[in-house]
């Protein structure tokens, strides 16, 4: 594919080549509205100097440094989340945003706190995914005292201390998973729920919603003891195989967090595609294939692009402002996928 030329950019912007040249080289002042139109067109057509254009267009805006602490860098979902954070940072038009993304492969308080301190040394606001530990709350409180706002994403933590939460209403997510299983199961019977850890408030709320739906609306189903999978495919695979052996009359299960790849492989291994009602979290290449093969009944997904745009806006707004400048919770509508809309 031919690389877009300056003429292509002028055509896409609806301005002359001379105007594009002025924006690129900053020789003469161009109206802000026109400069932004040229930049947006450059981004949309993949113009090679889009980085330079951004620098020219937004050079007078404040510079904000934002830190992000994510989990498990090898997982498809977190890779997608990182890409969307970068894109949202680059697309922000109220300030120039530099995003620093770090990962932690261990969910221990010490590992999380170490990364938070690293991010705090370089950034003005921080967002993190993690379990809710008292030690982490204490660290978030220390950051707050230093004027560094912390936001929880996907799973809430440090309630009353963190600046805000951006993610799904996890209780509703759990109830929706239960609703699907109750409707899709071949008959009433035993159902199970996997959580990554009881320290993940988001998983706990999903479990609460899952159980409450069955208790209120489908009492003829039996919800088994909750299974811990540490969000790893290996543990989830083994736990699913054991679950199916111990309860051959199982009619469905829900993986509320990570590790669904192991559950999917276990259902395939046991030849149970189409025989169980299975709900997983997030749409990834693995869950998409499982939906197509009738291994998974439904995937409940986070609108990652919307989450990142909202998060960047709230984080930049929080810098240098009072605590009530941003909402305490920002719930996003979740996406639902079945075999018919992937």
Task: Give short role names for the model-derived ranges.
Residues 214, 303-342:
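Hinge/cleft segment of the Venus flytrap/periplasmic-binding protein
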Residues 126-143, 210, 228-286:
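Hydrophobic alpha-helical
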Residues 71-77, 100-111, 132, 166-175, ...:
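Hinge/beta->alpha junction and helix N-cap segments in small-molecule ligand-binding domains
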Residues 1-54:
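N-terminal helix-turn-helix DNA-binding module of bacterial transcription factors
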Residues 125, 147-151, 164, 190, ...:
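Proline-centered loop/turn at the N-terminus of a beta-strand
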Residues 61, 165-191, 236-237, 287, ...:
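Hydrophobic alpha-helical segments within soluble ligand-binding/sensing domains
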Residues 49-114:
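Amphipathic helical "hinge" segments at domain boundaries
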Residues 133-172, 284-292, 296:
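Flexible loop/hinge segments that line or gate small-molecule binding clefts
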């Amino acid at each position: 594919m031919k690389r877009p030329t300056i003429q292509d950019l002028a055509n896409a912007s609806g301005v002359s080549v001379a105007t594009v040249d002025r924006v690129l080289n900053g020789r003469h002042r161009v109206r802000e509205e026109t400069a932004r139109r040229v930049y947006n067109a450059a981004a949309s057509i993949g113009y090679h100097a889009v980085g330079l254009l951004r620098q020219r267009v937004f050079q007078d805006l404040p510079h904000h440094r934002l830190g992000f602490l994510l989990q498990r860098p090898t997982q498809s979902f977190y890779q997608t989340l990182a890409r969307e954070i970068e894109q949202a940072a680059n697309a922000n038009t109220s300030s120039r945003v530099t995003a620093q993304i770090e990962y932690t492969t261990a969910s221990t308080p010490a590992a999380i706190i170490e990364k938070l301190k690293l991010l705090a040394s370089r950034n003005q606001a921080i967002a993190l995914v993690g379990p809710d530990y008292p030690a982490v709350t204490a660290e978030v409180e220390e950051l707050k005292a230093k004027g560094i706002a912390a936001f929880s994403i996907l799973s809430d933590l440090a309630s009353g201390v963190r600046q805000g939460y951006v993610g799904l209403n996890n209780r509703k997510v759990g109830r929706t998973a239960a609703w699907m299983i109750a409707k899709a199961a071949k008959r009433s019977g035993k159902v199970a729920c996997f959580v990554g850890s009881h320290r993940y408030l988001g998983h706990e709320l999903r479990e609460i919603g899952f159980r409450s739906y069955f208790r209120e609306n489908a009492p003829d189903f039996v919800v088994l003891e909750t299974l811990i999978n540490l969000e790893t495919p290996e543990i989830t695979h083994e736990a699913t195989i054991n679950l199916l052996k111990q309860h051959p009359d199982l009619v469905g299960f829900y993986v509320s967090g990570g590790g669904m790849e192991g559950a999917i492989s276990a259902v395939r291994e046991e030849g149970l595609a189409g025989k169980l009602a299975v709900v997983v979290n997030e749409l990834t290449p693995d869950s998409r294939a499982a939906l197509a093969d009738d291994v998974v009944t439904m995937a409940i997904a986070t609108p990652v692009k919307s989450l990142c745009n909202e998060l960047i806006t709230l984080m930049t707004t929080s810098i240098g402002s009072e605590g009530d400048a941003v909402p305490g919770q920002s719930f996003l509508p979740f996406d639902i996928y079945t075999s018919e809309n992937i």
